[in-house]
Amino acid sequence: MNKLTQQEEEVMLYIWSLKECFVKDIVAKFHEPRPPYTTVASIVTNLKRKGYVKAKRIGNTYLYTPNIRQSEYKRTFMGGFVHNYFANSYKEMVSFFAKEQKLTADDLKDIIDLIEKGKEE
């Protein structure tokens, strides 16, 4: 699975949220100023080439659907992120965000609750 560019990732997030869509639907999801239709169409073509979306021809346009689940993408690239930036230590990652004041004490409690629930299952 290839890593997506920032633009591709943004478009892919819209496709995941829409579940199936035309390029015009994706363009409509952007805030003003919206990118040109042709730019979004080009990005979607790249996503199709990379295997992230499937296209079904309907008349003279295409209906796009995700070919890769969002959870699968997250699992693959978050694992790489933790490996590359935090020596494969999730503890180091959480510590970093806590020190940078990106996580509150309540956030950390929620994380602990999630971990404990995961152990029970």
Where are each of the predicted segments found?
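Short, locally clustered residues in the helix-turn-helix/winged-helix DNA-binding domain
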Residues: L13-E20, A98
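Amphipathic alpha-helical dimerization/coiled-coil segments
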Residues: F77-E120
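Pre-recognition alpha-helix immediately N-terminal to the DNA-recognition helix
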Residues: E9-Y14, D25
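Short helix-coil-helix linker/hinge
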Residues: N2-Q7, E20, A87
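Glycine-centered, phosphate/nucleic-acid-interacting loop/turn motifs that mediate DNA/RNA or nucleotide
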Residues: G51
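Short, hydrophobic-biased segments on the C-terminal half of alpha helices
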Residues: A41-T45
